[in-house]
């Protein structure tokens, strides 16, 4: 039987508030993370992802207190990321109630950290977040590069090769955000989503660009992702999680 595809609302948290921006800029406030997480839990979301978007840029640690409050209200898997740099950071987040921890910038500077984390805590709770931007010129074979620090710093790393390396080191899942599409609401970058999903044996979560329910389905059917992540379409009430699941089921996608 086909594995159910997951719908994951994403909470980008800045100084304790859920925010949403366009291409990581022009931030607008969407509310209290614990309240919002509780709403998605009640709506039947499969998981919730909480990203402290200030953490890596400011070198600040993810707010454990918010994670504790959220974990006490939410009974679906919770992935937390932002400023995760050490084994102790991961232990603190798991102890606070996170089910999975997302590593982004630190993986680029120290890839072995991913292997160490997977050995210590198990691959099932280690997610590597990849922020990719298309760098190939029109007419060239498509190529995507990894960026860090909230999409500000290029690394020169090829996104598909990097994802394969992360899988080899023990990552259990890849959270793939297209920097070109983030906040644009005109769909995932299906090219990079498909390239990475097809290259790996671990689940890939598509992120960046959802503006309607068709985009979610396209991420699965055309992007070959295992899960789809969205923020603003849920936060600002355009669609609910049950509406998204009904739409995807109608397109022939197995949902929980």
Swiss-Prot record:
EC number assigned by the record: 4.3.2.10
Oligomer and partners: Heterodimer of HisH and HisF.
GO BP of this protein: L-histidine biosynthetic process
Name of the protein: Imidazole glycerol phosphate synthase subunit HisF
GO terms for MF: imidazoleglycerol-phosphate synthase activity; lyase activity
InterPro entries in the cross-refs: Aldolase_TIM (IPR013785), His_biosynth (IPR006062), HisF (IPR004651), IGPS_HisA/HisF (IPR050064), RibuloseP-bd_barrel (IPR011060)
Locations listed in the record: Cytoplasm
Recorded name of the encoding gene: hisF
Described purpose of this protein according to its UniProt entry: IGPS catalyzes the conversion of PRFAR and glutamine to IGP, AICAR and glutamate. The HisF subunit catalyzes the cyclization activity that produces IGP and AICAR from PRFAR using the ammonia provided by the HisH subunit.
Pathway: Amino-acid biosynthesis; L-histidine biosynthesis; L-histidine from 5-phospho-alpha-D-ribose 1-diphosphate: step 5/9
Enzyme class: lyase
